[in-house]
Amino acid sequence: MTRLNRLLLAAFTAAAATPHLFAAPAAPAAPAPPARLPEVVVRANPIHWPDPAAVAAALARPLLETNQPLTEVQDYIESRLPRLDAPRSKGEWQQTARELRRDTLEKVIFRGQARAWRDAELGVEWLDTIPGGPGYHIRKLRYEALPGLWIPALLYVPDNLSGTVPVVLNVNGHDRNGKAADYKQLRCINLAKRGMIALNVEWLGMGQLRGPGNNHGAMNQLDLCGTSGIAPFYLAMTRALDVLLAHRHADRKRVGVAGLSGGGWGTIFISSLDTRVTLANPVAGYSSFFTRARYFSDLGDSEQTPSDLATVVDYAHLTAMMAPRPLLLTFNAKDNCCFRAGHALQPLLDAATPVYHALGKPGALHYHVNLSPGDHNFGEDNREAFYEMLGHHFFPDQPGYSNREIPSQAEVKTAEQLAIPLPANNATLNSLARDLARNLPRREKTFTDQKTAGAWGPDHRLHLQMLVRGADLAVSAKHIAAGEKDGLWTSHWQLRLGGDWTVPVVELAYGVPKSTVVFIADAGRAKSSPEIERLLADGKRVLAVDPFYFGESKIASHDWLFAILAAATGERPLGIQASQVAAIARWGRDQFRQGPVELSTVGPRSSTFGLIATALEEKAIGKFERKNPLTSFKTLIDSNRSVNESPELFCFGLLEYFDIPQIELLVAPRQIVTR
């Protein structure tokens, strides 16, 4: 290091109260850098391309504690989850349950086109009857969950029925065999042999409905269009109940639902919200959102974590909403998938028990823990617990009723034997989203040119902010370190944003910076040296930022599941990211006093929330530069992208009003440069 550079470094270190590089003081009381420092540096070190090794080393320095991004997102989510208070009276709870049920249906499930799906006249087609086994037969059918989406199903019917009998809807989870899974067939067979009508339905994405179009992560494509992605899952179950209850021998007072895993989720979801269900047995299917935030195995995928569900209810609420109807909670002691009994069961019992007591039905709440085999199963032990539950509540006076499994393995059919013809163009989650996206954004709600954007800019900007849940985050800056090597000046920061997030920022300058640019990349700052070197060589001060979900701020495990869980609380990951970028831009403008900062992004994801930040932050962000940007949200649907690939891009309702071109118009007259 030259003597001059040693003097400059000493001066730089002495200015610790103003640790940013070559900037005017942030406040009058702070000491300014040496008056002639920039000119001296220029003469001593004419601008060259910065040393790549030095840039890479500065960018690679860790600024956050281990697991800090995880801890912060867990705390953020938990602070937004609804809590269940014990009811003070029977009447109070009944009113609460009615309101929760109404709000969940209206504000979460039946949004957008889902309302029309709910009210549509739909078909049921009865097909072949095949032999079952001693005492029962199987009727094949298909029914529409919503227009164009047919669900294959099997109805197990006892022979020689008379009068009315209990009916049971059997749903299932992530088993590629779907309705042909042997343990599901055995359950339906045993129900029929006990005199009940059992409906075995296929689940979206499984069995005959397997395929990329029904990947559960595709349901968020519907969310993007402003229609609830959870609606097809819910409607598939309500229509199944319609089919069951239309049977002339159905007893409407004895209506059960049971299922494993995703079927356990389906069981509590439909049973808590559809009061036609009079008994439910969810098996290893769910836990409270509070539990999920701390136990990664319980972080359910898209249907378990629909957008905005936790603005109304937690799964503890749904459990309590079964009261006073009989409920059997079944969990497995050594579950090798999810929802292990040791952590999942007790919070649900704690929530539901006071409600069952308040309603005078403490004996209607049951639980069962499977010890052998204890893994993720609805095996014989769990099935026998279910049969016992049915006997207790549906056949209390039947002498000789037994909960013992009736051996029926020889009657299990192959998937081919149980196959049901489906239309070649049967709808999928993806095809439904394609149909919706075709006419979006809605023309009467959007704008197409700079003139109309300018006229309605403030209104559209506010609407965009509301859709992404944008927030004005206060910034508290903590300076970590500063240094110089071969003319490259670096300063490391932690920026505390809104009291919730800590975002790492690396400040770099080579020579005299003529402007400040905030840089963000999908790959993270540490893998973006060439792009940052280019900006430095162009005479810019670079603030290399890793916002929520990227680079050093990336959650080490299950990251996309935490992102959709944040969306379930009513927040939007896209808005979190855009708000962080906007806050850092304001900080950079005020800190360095060179006017509005520029924003440079690399990658389709960072370019999208960077564009939104630029549209919303008119004063602090000037020029917006992007490389490899997303050109339309419709490409996510056309290419059948799943939410796990880029969860922030599936922001509920955004495409209904804004595509990328409309957001770009809100940036005008500021410059957008695409590389």
Question: What is each residue range found by the language model?
Answer:
Residues 1-6:
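Positively charged n-region of N-terminal signal peptides that target proteins for export
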Residues 9-20:
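Bacterial N-terminal signal peptides
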Residues 21-29:
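Boundary at the C-terminal end of the N-terminal hydrophobic targeting segment
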Residues 28-150, 180, 315, 323, ...:
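Alpha/beta-hydrolase-fold serine-hydrolase catalytic core, especially in secreted/extracellular enzymes
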Residues 98, 189, 268-269, 320, ...:
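Alpha-helical segments flanking ligand/cofactor-binding loops in enzyme cores
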Residues 162-246, 252, 286-296, 514-591, ...:
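Cap/lid segment of the alpha/beta-hydrolase catalytic domain
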Residues 194, 240-311, 584-657, 663:
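Primarily recognizes the serine-hydrolase "nucleophile elbow" in alpha/beta-hydrolase
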Residues 202, 258, 283-284, 330, ...:
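Alpha/beta-hydrolase-fold catalytic nucleophile elbow
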